[in-house]
């Protein structure tokens, strides 16, 4: 499960590097770490990225990993992601 989380985050970061301007990445991360969003709501919000039942199940498990975390951990994760957004690697593509 941890490997799945790392791979999904790596894919999101690569998408950011691929000239998304990081807005899509920021929105997805915010939805992922928002503990007020349930798994069914999360899947619905990200439906355009889910192309199979296996992907839907993986997204549900991915969201559950974050739902299992404390508020403090989620806050720290959000802070870490904002540090990534503000890094030279994301800003380099938007300049």
Curated annotation (Swiss-Prot):
SUPFAM superfamilies: Uteroglobin-like. This is Mammaglobin-B. It comes from Homo sapiens (Human). Glycans are attached at residue 68. Belongs to the secretoglobin family. Lipophilin subfamily. Heterodimer of a lipophilin A and a lipophilin C (mammaglobin B) monomer associated head to head. May bind androgens and other steroids, may also bind estramustine, a chemotherapeutic agent used for prostate cancer. May be under transcriptional regulation of steroid hormones. Expressed in thymus, trachea, kidney, steroid responsive tissues (prostate, testis, uterus, breast and ovary) and salivary gland.
